[in-house]
Structure formats: C-alpha cells, structure tokens
Amino acid sequence: MSVDNNQRDLEAGIHTDLQGRLTYGGYLRLDQLLSAQQPLSSPPHHDEMLFIIQHQTSELWLKLLGHELRAAIGFLQRDEVWQCRKVLARSKQVLRQLTEQWSVLETLTPSEYMGFRDVLGPSSGFQSLQYRYIEFLLGNKNAQMLQVFEHDPAGQAQLRTVLEAPSLYEEFLKYLARFGHAVPAVYEAHDWTQPHVADDALQPVFERIYQDTDRYWREYALCEDLVDLETAFQLWRFRHMRTVMRVIGFKRGTGGSSGVGFLAKALELTFFPELFQVRTSLQAAPPAEQA
C-alpha cells in the first residue's frame, strides 16, 4: 500500500475536541514530567541532559520493579504461584531494560562528563532510595544504609519498613514450609533486618526439589524464576560498574565512595545463594525401581 501524497489524513472518528477532557499529556502529567530536567551547568552543558534523563528513567523503572516485587511477595503469601511467576517474569524484563539502558550513557565520553561533573556536588546514585528498597526486598539487608537517608525522614521510614519485613526469598522459604518441605523453623520468624546468608540446612530442601522436578514442578519453576531474577540483577550491577569504569576510570565517586572498586564489591553479594549452591551439590537421581 502506498500513500500518494506522503501524508496520513485524520480519520473521521479521531477525537480532536479535547477541551476539558482527559488527554494523553494530562493522564501522564507530561507537563510535570518533561519539566523535571533542569541542568545545573551554566551555560547548560549539552550532555548533562543525557545524564539527567538516564537517571530519571532508571528511577521510573525502579519504581515499577518495586511495585512488581511487592506484588510477588503478596502472591507468595497467598500461595498464588502462577500470579507470582507472572510478575517475576515482568520484573526480569524491567531489569533487562535497565541493563540495556546503560548503552545510552556509554555514549558519554570522559571529557564530556568532566564538563559538568562538578555541578553534581555530593549527589550520587548511591543515594537512590528505590535502589536500596529493592535490594532490601530481595534480601540484601544492610541497616547501615539508613544513615544515608537521615536527610529524608519519610524515605528513611519507608526503607526501615522493608528492612524489618521478610524479603522475597524469606517469603518463598515460608511458602515451601507450608507445602511440606523441611525448611528450618527459624525462617518462620527471626530478625528480618539481617541479610540472608547461605545456610547449609536449606541445601537438602532444594536438592529434593531439583532431584524430582516432576513432583515439585511449582517449587522448581519458582526456584528457576528467582535464579533468572538474580542473574538479571547482577548483569545490571555489572553493566553499571563497567559503564562507570568507561566514563570516569578509577576516580572516586561523587558520593565519596571508591567508585569502581565499591561497585565491584556489590557483585559479590547474592540474594538466593542456595539456589546456586544446589547446582554444585546436586547428584543424579537414583534410577526408578523396576516392578
């Protein structure tokens, strides 16, 4: 099909009288959203707009990720496995989007960044409340992080709430216990503010599931969803570190951290350690007995 005059005419049914009615821009509050990019460099450095939008869009995706992970926890609490799997699948795609987004910031050269870096002062992505919130939801609890938000009592209170509640993984362990798996009783109630660390007592639970996936398919599928989620998150962390290395090398971060070295340490953190350890300890299932 060709358009002779290279113009697409409005169809008769398209709404054009929008006075006083809900519009696309009104629904999305684009007047507020698109006026939030305010470069501080003077005169405005061309590439500061990229830097601002990169981080603002990341925060929007993080908001959605937190929304989905809270839903996943709720579904687990109600034993709604398929609904939980759906939002975990969406969460993985959000993380993929966040990871690929670094390729845009990678177009920022070191000299371009140095042209406006000074105006950032001590501000840093390290201070992202939503990032810490998601880490806590996934089990990387660290009460020290609350200190970073002393300037924001409301945000600090929000972070404290998730610090003191069971993480996604802890809710998964409680789900397994409800369905007859030998999860130690300590996971029913303990100090939720502590990060989860690898527990040898959980290994038999996951070996049982992985050795008989037909029998425990729901549990196995959820395990693999969590493995996908952690892998996606770690890829995002890795891409972040490499982007920072590419743009600033080994300079200190604006927030006072060692920069790349500090980001690299995050790659050593894990959310669901037993789900990776079981791959080492797993043995072939014994052959079925012949009748």
Curated annotation (Swiss-Prot):
Alphabetically ordered keywords of this record: Dioxygenase, Heme, Iron, Metal-binding, Oxidoreductase, Tryptophan catabolism
Residues that bind heme: 240
Cofactor info, note text: Binds 1 heme group per subunit.
Catalytic activity entry: L-tryptophan + O2 = N-formyl-L-kynurenine
Function text: Heme-dependent dioxygenase that catalyzes the oxidative cleavage of the L-tryptophan (L-Trp) pyrrole ring and converts L-tryptophan to N-formyl-L-kynurenine. Catalyzes the oxidative cleavage of the indole moiety.
Subunit structure comment from the entry: Homotetramer.
Protein name from the UniProt record: Tryptophan 2,3-dioxygenase
The encoding gene: kynA
